[in-house]
Amino acid sequence: MPYPEQFIAPMRAELTRLGVRELRTTADVDAAVGAPGVTMIVVNSVCGCAAGKARPGIALALQHDRRPDVVGTVFAGADIDATDRARAYFEPFPPSSPSVGLLRDGKLVFMLQRSDIENRDARQIAERLTAAFDQYCESPARST
């Protein structure tokens, strides 16, 4: 049973207020991944490491001058089908939330799993993400 929307709405808003697009359906996920360039998909979560580490780290990383062309998010435990679709693009990595995947032209090029998040602070997570942005994003972001 999905989480009640009124419970998770503030957690969704932590990313959407940064310009991150919600990907609530499989079609939304496929469209984001099919966009040219680099797509970042965040698997958002209710857990403490999402609240205290992942979302703040993503917020810091998105201030970097070089960012993915498309930035989207699914919510584990709420956007069930969309989350499953995003995780299918993240194979061979096992399902993990929170997590962040970078895809270039539909192919996974970078993955940040829960195990990479839970023992780091927001600044360290941002550093990992911005290093990946510098490596895989060809130019400053056009849109989110």
Each predicted region: which residue ranges?
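Short helix-loop-beta junction
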Residues: F7, M11-E14, A59-P68
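Short acidic (Asp/Glu) patches
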Residues: T83-S97
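Local sequence-structure signature of Cys/Sec-based thiol-disulfide redox active-site neighborhoods
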Residues: A31-D65
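Structural signal for conserved beta-strand scaffold positions within catalytic alpha/beta enzyme cores
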Residues: R24, T73-F75, L102
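Conserved strand-to-helix beginnings and helix N-cap segments that scaffold or border functional pockets
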Residues: A51-P56, T83-D84, A122-R123
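Thiol-based oxidoreductase modules, predominantly thioredoxin-like and allied folds used
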Residues: V43, R66-R85
